Amino acid sequence: MKLPLLLALVVCSAVSTNLKMVSKRNSVDGCIDWSVDLKTYMALAGEPVRVKCALFYSYIRTNYSMAQSTGLRLMWYRNKGDLEEPIIFSEVRMSKEEDAIWFHSAEEQDSGFYTCVLRNSTYCMKVSMSLTVAENESGLCYNSRIRYLEKSEVTKRKEISCPDMDDFKKSDQEPDVVWYKECKPKMWRSIIIQKGNALLIQEVQEEDGGNYTCELKYEGKLVRRTTELKVTALLTDKPPKPLFPMENQPSVIDVQLGKPLNIPCKAFFGFSGESGPMIYWMKGEKFIEELAGHIREGEIRLLKEHLGEKEVELTLIFDSVVEADLANYTCHVENRNGRKHASVLLRKKDLIYKIELAGGLGAIFLLLILLLVVYKCYNIELMLFYRQRFGGDETTDDNKEYDAYLSYTKVDQDTLDCDNTEEEQFALEILPDVLEKHYGYKLFIPERDLIPSGTYIEDLTRCVEQSRRLIIVLTPDYILRRGWSIFELESRLHNMLVSGEIKVILIECTELKGKVNCQEVESLKHNIKLLSLIKWKGPKSSKLNSKFWKHLVYEMPIKKKEMLSHCHVLDSAEQGLFGELQPIPSIAMTSTSATMVPSQADLPEFHHSDSMQMRHCCRGYQHEMPANTLSVPSLGNHHTYCNLPLTLLNGQLPLNNSLKETEEFSRNNPLLPLTSKELSFTSDIW
């Protein structure tokens, strides 16, 4: 009888001693209420869970057996609002076992607070425990609301234990625990070791963060507990660092009175283990809360975060800046390692400064516009100036004989319309004359320079290959006759155009819209890889200082300009006997021919078609007549020179004796045109 009484006194003494060490949270009707214990019980629906009375583990220095032997009773209640309802244990799904409640198969409706009360006639104390039961989230083996949380610094050692496993441990053996990461089996690397019911990571890396689930079987049911591991940076030993304003470098902000203003304060916080960054503004020795109502702080914004390291921003807001606000403002940042600060000085904006700034920006803007306009209007002139001063010579060592191949249509003068005369005269006379005599380019003109050595197509292809540019003059007659067909039908010429082997200069002498074959011209443009399009606009383009000639020279090969004498204008086939002759305009040639040549009816075998075909093969040249030479009054000092027939050049004479006199007359008369037979190798389109 004395022994139980002595034991009761010891228990009561232990309880009383413990109560002196822990401050009471509440006391109702003489019963000490410790409110809700910090430990939270969590389980998935359908799994077993054990809720222990926290009094025996955190609040008194005794266990359930000793308390029971002294006459103390343990009773369980479930909190429903402000009421505590006694629990009736059914022994089927929920039962009482010593100091705990066993849920053999927990359900979501079991979630709530459970209170254990330990009392006798003299003493009473109680504490509540929280239980949360939830279903698995879709496709997962856990619910994110009932995860345990663990943190570890990167490169440190971390052990993740399986929570509450002691409740399911049998005395004779350790539980067989299986670990998963993100609900999937994983082949752990060598530095991750399973140690009993725990997982040991010897050196934590950033990718080790995630959800770890431990699983075991207990009485035929699965028990799973999930722990979220958050990997952080190493614990910092430095105070935060201000990013703006700069530390030890006060920033000056020019403000306009009456206008709103926002001043951001940005700072970097290393990982310190604290719940949140501490950042605030002050004006002198006063906090912002002590100032006028038109000045306030915004919300702290998280700009960046990585492994617990944060970059945050706090904005100082002025609804309307007044004169009294022109002062120094300081942004303070701190953690448990120290404090840093940075300052901003508000200064009234000077109107003159604003005008100067606007004027300077305006001047720069106008200068840029002026330069843009100058370049837009004179870009070709600028490029030509640069090429003349600093450019090289494109014709050096390229193994090409001609600067350009000139392709145009040879038209009979009598068939020209009055509307097309200017275009055809430009193609036949003005264009080659200016390029060769004024700019010193060497052109290949098939009518003049083609010397047959094989078939016509082969000779033409060879000459195009020897040229650096291909100039196509789109006159009305050229378009009508589809003069470009040869460049599409002959495969070698076509390949040169589409591959960019030769650059093509396309000169439009007329408006293409509405013309016959205009669609084919557009198709030709699309097929040429290197194409430059230049438009000739009639007489105003004929002036040497016009935009047309500058553009044309810009597209021609880069070469050093050479002043040519009149004798150099003639090609090699025209030198020798006629080397000193000077060219005269076609009008003079026509008048000369009309004066000296007998009438067409008087010439034997003279055909009108031959005359039209050969009119462009004759050229007039001017030279000084010797004093002792008898001049023809109707001619003055003009002579007319025609190309020699190929039959004469080759030393061949016709076999037909009946035509001997006529042919002899033709050979001895320099004013007659070549016959169609002698020019059988030529073409109307060059």
From Swiss-Prot:
Q: Which Pfam families does the UniProt record give?
A: I-set (PF07679), Ig_2 (PF13895), TIR (PF01582)
Catalytically driven reaction(s): NAD(+) + H2O = ADP-D-ribose + nicotinamide + H(+)
Listed as disulfide-bonded, the cysteine pairs are C53-C116, C162-C214, C265-C331
Residue limits of the TIR domain?
400-556
User: Where are the active-site residues found?
Assistant: E488
What tissues has this protein been observed in?
Detected in fetal brain after day 12.5, in particular in parts of the diencephalon and in the basal plate of the spinal cord. In postnatal brain detected in cerebral cortex, olfactory bulb, in the CA1 region of the hippocampus and in Purkinje cells of the Xth cerebellar lobule.
Domain of life of the organism in this record?
Eukaryota
What family is this protein classified in?
Belongs to the interleukin-1 receptor family.
Q: What is this protein called?
A: X-linked interleukin-1 receptor accessory protein-like 2
**Species per Swiss-Prot/TrEMBL record:** Mus musculus (Mouse)
